[in-house]
Amino acid sequence: MGSVVAILRVMPESPDIDLEKLKKALKDALPGIKDIQEEPIGFGLKALKLAAIVNDAGGETDALEGKLNAVPGVERAEIIEVTLN
């Protein structure tokens, strides 16, 4: 099995959340994160778009979403793209 790059969008719970603290919490929860960018959504809310390298074994992407959704301050994490590493 190889690895893939998963691109995810993470929506914070509110526009008032400290995005730098959330970025650190996400990196702590998932060491495979390689890049995090802020993406304006509207009304002051910003999503975080991140790239993570994960094993391409079955169920790994679901587990990835689960880990990120469990981070305090995350409203929702969803995979928007998966590509070969």
UniProtKB/Swiss-Prot annotation:
UniProtKB keywords: Elongation factor, Protein biosynthesis
- Please list every transmembrane segment annotated in the UniProt record, as residue ranges: none
> Where does the source fall among the domains of life?
Archaea
- PANTHER family assigned: ELONGATION FACTOR 1-BETA (PTHR39647:SF1)
Role according to the record: Promotes the exchange of GDP for GTP in EF-1-alpha/GDP, thus allowing the regeneration of EF-1-alpha/GTP that could then be used to form the ternary complex EF-1-alpha/GTP/AAtRNA.
- Stored NCBIfam families: aEF-1_beta, PRK00435.1
Which protein family is named in the record? Answer: Belongs to the EF-1-beta/EF-1-delta family.
Indicate what this protein is called per its UniProt record: Elongation factor 1-beta
Q: Which organism is it from?
A: Methanoregula boonei (strain DSM 21154 / JCM 14090 / 6A8)
